[in-house]
Each structure stands twice: as structure tokens, then as C-alpha cells.
């Protein structure tokens, strides 16, 4: 049998497996409409960005405005009696880094090297979705679970006067106090009560984790080429996120479990958001954006429809455009 025929047969079989076509209306998944998505691409993109803005606003409110759930504490608890040290990586330094660094690399790779605006859009959208979802989830955990920072007592700064003016102690031995005995400002105490999970760790893992997936997909790090510098770039993203998280333990802002929880949240969301915008996480097509995937899908679907129409036309003996031998006029055959 001809080898080319076998290759074409295999390719057609692979295409059928890759692109599942739902011919019957009742067999389609919910909200699965080819024509709507094809005709309303800009509306879908606008909706995605609106969701990002909403998530950022809600997450910011949870972080900055909502009072966290209070925790009871004792005045002789050594685990929350650490000194208040200067932050190794303050938030006003972290935010520009986790935004500017991935943005710069994505611009270079997508716009300068690949010159693909759609790939750039999905990379930026995925990064924004990752940060927005992480901010929302981290803020929710901080508000509804919270936790005492290792330097809580020094930040709280209870004095004899504030202890006397606050709520009386509770518990079996009457040794547990609440935040009412703190003499510091409410905003400072609120931050000291929001140790779980680490916000630095989660948003850094979300940003640098997404960036690591992006670089790995574009350059195919483990593609039997042995380029150590590409491996260093990808692993550097993960190491950077790890070091920023560990810095929060070193300056007594978090315990290691707080940091580990933040890492887990950020990495899981980074993986999810990358897959939302690209064809796979670690497959051979993990560099293909969803836009390119749908273009190929639509073309394949349109070709199938055209082929089906041609087949129907070949059996339609009344159709004038049909050029099958069965419906060509006799006078044309006699020419």
C-alpha cells in the first residue's frame, strides 16, 4: 500500500481524535457553540478582562478593607513574641517586580521574537488572571481564617492601660485575650492577625510560576537539546518565588506553613490559568495559544461542513450546481 496514503489516513484519524465535532445539537456540552464563539471573539475577550478587573477589586477590598477574623492569644506565648524587623522584600518593591519582569519577558518573546499579537494577548491575560485569582483567594483565606504573625505581640503592643480597657480574658484559666487589648492602630493589628496564608508567597508563585510555564513552553527546555542556560532561566523563576517566600520567615512575618500554603495557592492557580490560555501544560503543543487552537478548530469544522455539503450535493439530482455525471444534460454529453 502506498506510504503517502497511510500517512494521510493517520493524519485524518489524528485530526478526528483531536477535534471532537458535536453534530447533534443535544449532544453538545452546555454553552458550547461554535458560531457564537467565532462571531463574538472580542466580546469574549472583553468579558475575560472585565472578570479580571472585578476579581482584582474584590481581592483588593478583602486585603485592605475587610477586618480579619480575630484570634485569641496569651501574653506569654513565645511563638508570637519575635521582634519586629524591617521587611527584606517590602510590598512596594514586590509588586513592580512580579508585574514588570514577566511583562518584559512576554513582550520580548511574543511581540519581538514571535511577532504574534494573539499569543501576547493570551500571555498577558493569563498572567493577569493568575494574579487576580490568587489575590482573591489569598484575601479570602486571610479574612476568614487569619492567623497570628510570629511578631504579633510586639506589633500589638499591649500595655497595662490597654489590657485594663480591653475585653476580659476568656478560656478555662482566663488567659486568652483578643485584639481589643492592643494599643497599636487597628490597621496594623489587622495586618498582624492575617498571617495565613502568606500573600508574598502566593502572588510571587502565581506570577513567577506562570512565567516559568511560559518560558518552558516557548523554548522547550526538555527537548533533548541540553541548553543549561534555558534551564537556569526557568528554574530561576521557581527559585525566586521560593526565596521571596523564605524571606517572610526570616523577618518573622510568617511561619513556614504560612509560606507553604501561599506557594501552593499561587502555583495551582498559575497552572490553571496557563492551561486556560494555552493548549496544554507540558505537552508538545503547550506553546499554542487558545486563539490559534480555535482558528485551527474552526477551519477544521468548516472543512467538514463543506465536505458534508459536497456529498449531499452529489446525490441531489435536482441541483443545478451539481456536476456529477448523473445530472449532466444529455446535450452536454453529446458535445
UniProtKB/Swiss-Prot annotation:
Keyword tags: Membrane, Transmembrane, Transmembrane helix
Spans traversing the lipid bilayer: 43-63, 93-113, 124-144, 202-222, 226-246, 254-274
Main subcellular location: membrane
Origin: domain of life: Eukaryota
Single Gene Ontology BP annotation: phospholipid metabolic process
Pfam families: PAP2 (PF01569)
Stored InterPro entries: P_Acid_Pase_2/haloperoxi_sf, P_Acid_Pase_2/haloperoxidase, PA_PP_rel
Membrane topology: Multi-pass membrane protein
SMART domains recorded: acidPPc
Subcellular location: Membrane
An example Gene Ontology molecular-function term: phosphatidate phosphatase activity
CDD domains: PAP2_containing_1_like
SUPFAM superfamilies: Acid phosphatase/Vanadium-dependent haloperoxidase
One GO cellular component term: membrane
Keyword Transmembrane in annotation: yes
Coiled coil stretches, renumbered: none
Family: Belongs to the PA-phosphatase related phosphoesterase family.
Name this protein carries in UniProt: PA-phosphatase related-family protein DDB_G0275547
